[in-house]
Amino acid sequence: MDNSSQSKPSSSSSSHSPSPAAITPTQRTTRDSGLCSTIDIPEIQAQCIDNLNSHYLGKGTYGLVEKTRYRKTRQDDFRPAAIKYSSQLHMATLIREAKVMWDLRNHPNIIKIYGLYKSPRNGQGVVMEYMDCGSMADLLYDRTHINYTIDHVASWMFQLSSAVDFFHSNSQVHRDLKLQNMLLSDRYRTMKLCDFGTFTSMHQSMTSNRGTPITMAPEVFRCEQYNMKSDIYSIGIIMWQIIARNHPYRRDLSVPGLLYNVATANLRPQELECNPILSEFYKKCWNDNADIRPTSSECVEYFTLLKDEYPNGSVPLSDSSTNGPAETPPPHAHRPTMLGTSSGSGIGSNNRTPTASKLLNPQQPGQGHRRNRSETFVVQPDLPYPTVPGEAGASRIPKSQSEAKNFRDRAKSEQRQPHRDARPPPPFEHRRDSNDEEKHAVFMNICSNEETRPIDPDTRDEKSLEIFHQHCDNNKQYADAWVIKKEVMRAKHELIAQWPQHDHTVELLERKYYLEQEIARYRDIQDDNYFSTERM
């Protein structure tokens, strides 16, 4: 209420106390503040979905994903689409993600949502556009026969930074940027962001562990106050992954060991032999000091210049196995990993051998614009673990480096090894992939809880580091025990459900035994009668 609207009391009423001004209640903002309501998202009718041609694509973080055909009205033709369903437990998360995507639907590098659809078979779902080339992780690590150049890197990174800058300009942050959330289409030339389940507004106090460990900013793991610069850190890691076409960290490194060393020992991906124009930028993006990282608009400006220098990002990718253009892959189910919810690379997810990239190296300043020979980005040999650049870094935390290595070795030794002998596998061994993902989720929830998360250690104090390691180990053991208990209870309920069938089987066996005895007794009587007749 404006002050001008409150008239002062007249002199005739000066003996009376003026009425107090109305107090405006403080509105409590939540991470859903500013999002559209569900009624703003159109409800898709059953006749607009071709259920007969729908088939399973894969399993996401909160439910399954199907490929289907969708049309806006009965007069329109069907076109490919994807439907993301959710279990009842995570329905609120799915609806919230739909609201976010609906608000961002006008950006060309963000997945478009068509509406909400209630399936008689799978329940509530969100219908969105279908990206026919899979994720960036699929391209980098699975389809190594498909080649790309620095032109495509510049184009993809420009599209990514453009989408990030779009919601950063509205004071919103994604918090889970990764290769698996970058979907490709149009012969791998168009990139769009998906999975906005962790999306939130900057008006909220953000200190919780949200995101994927490989691209999680160190301040997020330290449970410090963080901001939009956490997305910039993820951009730096993604840029390194696409340039190197490699995994940023050792595949045998445990999740707690990775997060601890990134947050306290400044662990980063290996050095690449590439143009300093590229390496200096992604190193600036993943700087431990968030204030040094560039803004999203500066990222757009940088990748715009890089794209102008290498403008052939619109050229279709080539397939080295056929010496022709890369074909659109058939739809397939995404692989589960222990670190994320979808396909792609993850620490300990599988045993794929990292493949070196075959990108064309940007020429040094002063050379001609177009390249006349092919060069490759070369990954240097494994660096000491963890990498601390310069003498200053070596003198800063010599003990924490050794302690971090011991922590990694101890965590690694606790991991279950695959069975190589002929003995039968232990119970629930066939569910290891899903268990690892669930254990990681439980572990991250424990570490984000103010009552159970480890207190940040003093890297100069050996006792403080030891206590931190023990706390992390206890949290990991608790997560393992919680998941095992859940599996045991599930097996118990399955046995209870099968008990009536077991009773029926026992009853049938008893009847069978009784009949066998009766038949044997009848045969004995017949034999006795036969011998009696012969003697007579």
From Swiss-Prot:
Residues 405-438 have a biased composition (Basic and acidic residues). One of its GO terms (biological process) is canonical Wnt signaling pathway. SMART domains: S_TKc. The keyword Nucleotide-binding applies. Residues 1-34, 314-438 are annotated as: Disordered. GO terms for cellular component: cytoplasm; striated muscle dense body. This is Mitogen-activated protein kinase kinase kinase mom-4. It comes from Caenorhabditis elegans. The gene is mom-4.
